Amino acid sequence: MAAHLSYGRVNLNVLREAVRRELREFLDKCAGSKAIVWDEYLTGPFGLIAQYSLLKEHEVEKMFTLKGSRLPAADVKNIIFLVRPRLELMDIIAENVLSEDRRGPTRDFHILFVPRRSLLCEQRLKDLGVLGSFIHREEYSLDLIPFDGDLLSMESEGAFKECYLEGDQTSLYHAAKGLMTLQALYGTIPQIFGKGECARQVANMMVRMKREFTGSQNSVFPVFDNLLLLDRNVDLLTPLASQLTYEGLIDEIYGIQNSYVKLPPEKFAPKKQGGGSGGKDLPTEAKKLQLNSAEELYAEIRDKNFNAVGSVLSKKAKIISAAFEERHNAKTVGEIKQFVSQLPHMQAARGSLANHTSIAELIKDVTTSEDFFDKLTVEQEFMSGIDTDKVNSYIEDCIAQKHPLIKVLRLVCLQSVCNSGLKQKVLDYYRREILQTYGYEHILTLNNLEKAGLLKAQTGGRNNYPTIRKTLRLWMDDVNEQNPTDISYVYSGYAPLSVRLAQLLSRPGWRSIEEVLRILPGPHFEERQPLPTGLQKKRQPGENRVTLVFFLGGVTFAEIAALRFLSQLEDGGTEYVIATTKLMNGNSWIEALMEKPF
């Protein structure tokens, strides 16, 4: 059992066990020794559900990455392809199967589509002449993956682009399916609130799916009180700004994939006697660390503003140092025994402290640089409404010095969003400069950003952002980063719009912000799901509500930190569980919208 998944009000181990059981059942259908051929993208998410030990218990002897031509030799009875339903992957699978058939003794082939079977893919396999080779063709509905005790993600990398650019609702269907699975395990969610076009569609799909399952009455006592469905395009601003929490900065600088981060190895080299680390013994392979709340220290610092992390680390260092000094005071056998029993925990704490001190040093090298400061200053000026309507000299300099294109696009999009679109001549100027400097092939990327609403010309000459900013208190001048009193600490002044909507829904309710809700894109709505008699929830005095916030189109670690902050408020009244189509940051978001024609 993954202990860190069961610490919150909602025990997410129940979900993890359900998906593990489904996987075990499929593996047992394929009797005998097995090799799994993985769609490489799935190995990370699967690692959070089932370690190799579980697969081994069910006779999985070999694992390969899906690649063209022949499969590596493996003396096994079954070959299982575990893949997303993508047409290009079907071509590779067909190549693998045909080359195996020519190789000699027959194997049993099976295919497991994640998260859904696809008629198009099966037709492609048929056209390639291999569909009949598969004994089992099934689907594994891994819609929502538990990442932490309050965090679920579909890890659907193309969800935002599919929904907002291509009009493809597949990921919305998977989101609705995932929510139905949650309700089967944790009870019907009595109230659904939503904002945005995609939110409306997911709610409609859920109602339709519920009608189809009318025969099976859900008799599970509800754990969640509310579901809030939020479209990413209701708040395009937040992911574009630089996250300033510890976890957010790790993701911005190094990228967190499936709760793992890869870091420069030299910072983690063991120190040699006499200080310094040995030159020729320096490790060359990236240091890979898992980041979740199973690690006590990480759970404590992950959601803090980075400026508050240093003092926590130095306090921890003193406590650990004092604990190790205790060994000199251990005189009796009993005292020595007690010290020895605590040693493994103390050594783990010391290792954890060393790792996070190194990570904090790496981050500090970036955050104390002149360029980081200049970029942050410009971002904060835009978010507080300063000089958003004219060409920005810092952005001009970045283009002239050919800074990474993603950085430039993030800033231009941020300026556009904070001005409800750019004046036509400002937009034309940026567009011309970007294409001349970075290449005309990027016209496709700029078109995508315009389609998504991230970059646009101001229509009607009206800037709605100041109204939204004031009504929702999105900019706070005096932020206490050490002991925050408001969610704006996660961006050192800017309160994420998405999280402010969740906060206001909880108290005093959205009626207080009707005017702003009408300005923001998409409908807002409320649905009630009737509960069977006897399952109505009677809350105890002082017991908090539990709200599931589902971000359709992606969520950042800073937004997650802000929701956790609200959960921990003594008089907050609501605890939050977060679900999303994808964990993302501004860079990965813009990158997913970039076209690579060559």
Curated annotation (Swiss-Prot):
* Gene Ontology BP term (one): regulation of lysosomal lumen pH
Domain of life (superkingdom) = Eukaryota
Where does the record place it?
Cytoplasmic vesicle; Late endosome membrane; Lysosome membrane; Early endosome
| Keyword terms | Autophagy, Cytoplasmic vesicle, Endosome, Lysosome, Membrane, Protein transport, Transport
Q: Which GO terms describe its cellular component?
A: AP-3 adaptor complex; autophagosome; clathrin complex; clathrin-coated vesicle; CORVET complex; early endosome; HOPS complex; late endosome membrane
Per UniProt, what is the membrane topology?
Peripheral membrane protein
Q: Which Pfam families match?
A: Sec1
Cystine residue pairs: none
Q: What does this protein do?
A: Plays a role in vesicle-mediated protein trafficking to lysosomal compartments including the endocytic membrane transport and autophagic pathways. Believed to act as a core component of the putative HOPS and CORVET endosomal tethering complexes which are proposed to be involved in the Rab5-to-Rab7 endosome conversion probably implicating MON1A/B, and via binding SNAREs and SNARE complexes to mediate tethering and docking events during SNARE-mediated membrane fusion.
Binding partners and assembly:
Core component of at least two putative endosomal tethering complexes, the homotypic fusion and vacuole protein sorting (HOPS) complex and the class C core vacuole/endosome tethering (CORVET) complex. Their common core is composed of the class C Vps proteins VPS11, VPS16, VPS18 and VPS33A, which in HOPS further associates with VPS39 and VPS41 and in CORVET with VPS8 and TGFBRAP1. Interacts with RAB5C. Interacts with UVRAG, STX17, MON1A and MON1B. Associates with adaptor protein complex 3 (AP-3) and clathrin. Interacts with PLEKHM1.
Q: Tell me which disease this protein is linked to.
A: Defects in Vps33a are the cause of the buff mutant which exhibits hypopigmentation in the coat and eyes, due to reduced size and number of melanosomes in their cells. In addition, mice are prone to prolonged bleeding, due to a platelet-storage pool defect.
Q: Family per UniProt?
A: Belongs to the STXBP/unc-18/SEC1 family.
Q: Which protein, by its recorded name, is this?
A: Vacuolar protein sorting-associated protein 33A
Mind giving the lineage of the organism this protein is from? Eukaryota, Metazoa, Chordata, Craniata, Vertebrata
Gene responsible for this protein:
Vps33a
